[in-house]
């Protein structure tokens, strides 16, 4: 009886094994297997053709912006000397036109030229009619050239003078605070001191260094 059962189960086992083998063969020979095989061949061919230390071109290996090429120091020095010589010629001939300057005074920056008026919301310990020199000059410009400070220009290179022409007070400003049904009301009048300056002259050195 046991031999008959074993003989009957043996064909069933062989049939299942043959079915499983046929499924694995069909799966390996399908379109997915072909694509995987071609991808593996392509990867192996790329790895074989790329040299040692090859870095692919990406946004990290090669940035999208152009490479900055620094100028030659000798060429830059020669160009600087030419520009300075040309500016010296303009200054010596007085052909620079009307000068303007950017000065730092009373915690503000002012762009001024000759005969300009500056209204400063501050009180200065200077009497009317006195002449002062603005030492913090950030920039001086003309028609054809501009001298930039880093951050300030030297005192021996530029001179800006001004005169105090008026010391007065601002127009009264009323600051009113009120809360209804609270019996709260506060009134304050604000008056700030003011000083008016007139720019007299803007002068530059006769020759740059």
UniProtKB/Swiss-Prot annotation:
SUPFAM superfamilies: L21p-like (SSF141091). InterPro entries: bL21-like, bL21-like_sf. Belongs to the bacterial ribosomal protein bL21 family. The lineage of its organism: Eukaryota, Metazoa, Chordata, Craniata, Vertebrata. The gene is MRPL21. GO terms for molecular function: structural constituent of ribosome. Residues 46-70 are annotated as: Disordered. It is found in: Mitochondrion. Component of the mitochondrial ribosome large subunit (39S) which comprises a 16S rRNA and about 50 distinct proteins. Residues 1-50 form a transit peptide. This is Large ribosomal subunit protein bL21m. GO terms for cellular component: mitochondrial inner membrane; mitochondrial large ribosomal subunit. It comes from the Eukaryota. Keywords: Mitochondrion, Ribonucleoprotein, Ribosomal protein, Transit peptide. Pfam families: Ribosomal_L21p. Its main location: mitochondrion. PANTHER family: 50S RIBOSOMAL PROTEIN L21, LARGE RIBOSOMAL SUBUNIT PROTEIN BL21M.
């Amino acid at each position: 009886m046991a031999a008959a059962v074993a003989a009957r189960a043996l064909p069933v086992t062989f049939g299942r094994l043959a079915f499983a083998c046929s499924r694995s063969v069909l799966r390996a020979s399908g379109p997915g297997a072909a694509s995987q095989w071609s991808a593996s061949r392509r990867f192996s061919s790329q790895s074989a053709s790329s040299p040692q230390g090859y870095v692919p071109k990406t946004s990290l290996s090669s940035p999208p912006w152009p490479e900055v090429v620094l100028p030659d120091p000798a060429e830059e020095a020669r160009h600087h000397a030419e520009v300075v010589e040309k500016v010296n010629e303009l200054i010596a001939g007085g052909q620079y036109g009307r000068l303007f300057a950017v000065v730092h005074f009373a915690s503000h920056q002012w762009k001024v030229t000759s005969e300009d008026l500056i209204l400063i919301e501050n009180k200065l310990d200077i009497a009317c009619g006195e002449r002062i020199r603005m030492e913090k000059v950030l920039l001086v410009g003309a028609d054809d050239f501009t001298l930039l400070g880093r951050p300030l220009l030297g005192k021996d290179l530029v001179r800006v003078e001004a005169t105090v022409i008026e010391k007065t007070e601002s127009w009264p400003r009323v600051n009113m605070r009120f809360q209804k049904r609270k019996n709260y009301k506060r009134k304050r009048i604000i008056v700030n001191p003011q000083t008016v300056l007139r720019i007299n002259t803007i002068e530059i050195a006769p020759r740059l260094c």
